[in-house]
Swiss-Prot record:
The gene is luxF. Gene3D superfamilies: Luciferase-like domain. It comes from Photobacterium phosphoreum. Its cofactor is FMN. Keywords: Flavoprotein. Homodimer. This is Non-fluorescent flavoprotein. Binds 2 FMN per subunit. Each FMN has a myristate attached. This flavin-fatty acid linkage is probably the result of an enzyme-catalyzed reaction, most likely the bioluminescence reaction itself.
Length: 231
């Protein structure tokens, strides 16, 4: 892992007719390798009043966008970016390295901007990136996650490394399987159930446990979607 490349986020949503849950894990609909917004990996877009226009000039750079399948999302990097997304009712992707307070502040700003522009966002669903490390020993889970992200945090937030990395870990998902599910459910409630989740399990060092957790969680998603007639 270098400073620009810090996780593969799997979108493990269940397709109707998919009979084998593990296939959804092994053949995820999309794998998203999150890259620092200032690199050239993302397409950078300038949104004008009528359509999306890609711009090459640095001074025209307004927002990073991410495509998942056929859907377009705007990376929630600032209030300005969020305001632009709301103007066109585009959904957001919230970053894993923002603390929950910052994510919620940006969501509130998005909602206020949508109201300002008279945009109906009732059907808009955002994505929230989360690192997940499941371990009955919560301290082990936190240490593994810290080891996985510390190079990136040291490069991006060197002046407050210890405080930053602790806050980031607290705003991601670590602990027992039950505690992790409870945390995600609670977080969904804080976001008024307007977000889906991009989950990264790469910090888990036990590869067999990681695969087991992904399959179990995928089954949980399938059951939830079946119970709520979402498939």
């Amino acid at each position: 892992m270098n400073k620009w490349n810090y996780g593969v986020f799997f979108v493990n949503f269940y397709n109707k007719g998919q009979q084998e849950p593990s296939k959804t894990m092994n053949n995820a609909l999309e794998t998203l390798r999150i890259i620092d917004e200032d690199t050239s990996i993302y397409d950078v877009i300038n949104i004008d009043d009528h359509y999306l226009v890609k711009k090459d000039s640095e001074d025209k750079k307004l927002a990073s966008f991410i495509t998942l399948g056929e859907k377009l999302y705007v990376l929630a990097t600032s209030e300005n970016t969020v305001d632009i997304a709301a103007k066109y009712a585009l959904p957001l992707v919230f970053k894993w390295d923002d603390i929950n307070e910052e994510r919620l502040k940006l969501l509130s700003f998005y909602n206020a901007s949508a109201s300002k522009y008279n945009k109906n966002i009732d059907l808009v669903r955002h994505q929230l990136m989360l690192h997940v490390n499941v371990n009955e020993a919560e301290t082990v889970a936190k240490e593994e996650l810290k080891l996985y992200i510390e190079n990136y945090v040291a490069c991006t937030q060197p002046s407050n490394f210890n405080g930053s990395i602790d806050s980031i870990i607290q705003s991601n998902v670590t602990g027992s399987y039950k505690d992790c599910l409870s945390y995600v459910a609670n977080l969904a409630g804080k976001f008024d159930n307007t977000v889906d989740f991009l989950l990264c399990f790469e910090s888990m060092q036990d590869q067999n446990k990681k695969k087991s957790v992904m399959i179990d969680l995928n089954n949980q998603v399938i059951k939830f979607r079946q119970d709520n007639n979402l498939i």
